[in-house]
Amino acid sequence: MKKYQRLAEQIREQIASGVWQPGDRLPSLREQVASSGMSFMTVGHAYQLLESQGRIIARPQSGYYVAPHPVCRSVATAAHVIRDEAVDINTYIFEMLQASRDTSVVPFASAFPDPRLFPLPQLNRSLAQVSKTATAMSVIENLPPGNAELRYAIARRYAQQGITVSPDEIVITAGALEALNLSLQAVTAPGDWVVVENPCFYGALQALERLRLKALSIPTDVKEGIDLMALEQALQEYPVKACWLMTNSQNPLGFTLSAEKKALLVALLTHHNVTLIEDDVYSELYFGREKPLPAKAWDRDDTVLHCSSFSKCLVPGFRIGWVAGGSHARQIQRLQLMSTLSTSSPMQLALVDYLSTRRYDAHLRRLRRQLAERKQQAWQTLLRHLPAEVKIHHNDSGYFLWLELPEQLDAGELSAKALEHLISIAPGKMFSTSGAWTRFFRFNTAWHWGEREEQAVKQLGSLIREMLSAKSLV
């Protein structure tokens, strides 16, 4: 029996004997580490095992409690591999982004949803309305930390999920990427180590390159997410200052971390005094009944800088994002003043006007339904036209699919061939510091599906079959 299993059995016996009653709060992870002498992750896995058995439950920002009734849950398993890598992003990413801008190219490589899914007429009316009433003072009023009404509106949306965030700690930014970059800059210095997922969003790698930071890439599973055992190993071996992670609808894999894993993640980083920069731009694009909580929901020690935006769920062109910066909010404001000065005043005012109409949630419900339908349609189309050797990794949120080619094929080569036919895909090496994931590519399912898209998938299937035939002759 392993250590975490012995600890779980010990706690289970204590619950059975009445030492801990239903509803009782168990010792925190840190308290259990101190009393048992075991490692943080050993204790974390013991609690996770008990939770999977339905014997305890995790409550955001509160801790672990003895459950009144057993609830069956699954426990994540992961590999134990870690590597440290210097960051060097080549021009390949920029070439792919340029291809995505060409309207003659089928945009399966795009990171954005179909703009026709957004309520652009209503947003344009809001923009026209505020342009009529804007004054010279509007620019001053919308300097960092940003428009007060917009910050209050965002704070209220946190409150709807039971998360207390003061409007005063929210900084409005020019999209989520600025929020993430400013957050990273606020808690690191050149040469510091930063943890990223492997694979991860290429914007994170570009930010690390620009700020001359060093990356630790942690193995990340397409279903279960980041390997917490490997993360703990990295935190023990390297002086890590920050973690840049996606916890909901991760790009490019598409997974959403379980509530149990989010709780363990925050507790682990808090234990090691490492800041989590949470990239949560896809959190509204869930397909289930309830919106998944961000890791921020388990933050009681100012560990998490939560970053999001309206770009992926409402209006990309406005470039309005934010960070719930906690004690770092003032430093983030200062950094913003020294770089972009402030976020567009008319865009902030237009968003305030639109959000006041209460149409936002109705739009989100419609958007989620359309994205789910398009993802299902794309998946079925890919199954019909791609060779059986291609594996399609599917998650029930967001609008990305992660495709895996057979061993001998290279997605970069497929991408180059596809571009000759005006089809773009996002090869896996865009999402790694080392150029790994060469057999994988990300596929955007959010665009309108018609004859053009159907023929493009057929062409991809033909190209893959040609590559397989060529390899078999070697």
Describe each model-derived feature in a short phrase.
Residues V274, V304, V390, I423:
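Short, conserved active-site loop motifs that form the nucleotide-linked donor/cofactor pocket
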Residues M1-A128, Q333, L337-S344, R365, ...:
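N-terminal basic, amphipathic alpha-helical segments
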Residues I82-G175, L182, S356, S424, ...:
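N-terminal small-domain helix-loop-helix segment of the aminotransferase-like
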Residues R369-W379, V390-E404:
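Conserved glycine-rich beta-strand-loop-beta hairpin in the small C-terminal domain of fold type I
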Residues L123, R300-R369:
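Conserved core segment of the aminotransferase class I/II
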Residues M137-H272, E284-W298, L371, G461, ...:
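Conserved core of the PLP fold type I
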Residues V196, S217, L276-E278, L351, ...:
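Hydrophobic residues in well-ordered beta-strands that form the structural core
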